[in-house]
Amino acid sequence: MTEQKIQNEIILAIYQRGHRLFRANAGKVITKDNRVIKLLPKGFPDTFGFRKTDGKFIAIEVKTETGRLRPEQIKFQTFAETQNILYGVARSPQDAIDIIENGAIYHE
């Protein structure tokens, strides 16, 4: 299964449980008229949002079963683990649910 398909399934599963999760775009985009638009920083997780029960910030990196974190993603992971947020690497909707509802921490 592709990362995009897993991500879509995760977002749907999380919405169905009442939490909110949004797709994140990192890096930069060059428009047709050659303007550069900076998005989120490199390494920012694939999805972010908030938990319905307390509004706690969620950041979830989505990977396939064999996917590995890039150096920029490892840097964000190291930072996230020092913050009072919900962060993890999810390879399935159940992983994401566990991160959000049970405080599970998944690494690569």
Describe the residue ranges of each PLM region.
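Catalytic phosphate/metal-binding cores of nucleic-acid and nucleotide-processing enzymes, i.e., regions
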Residues: 1-108
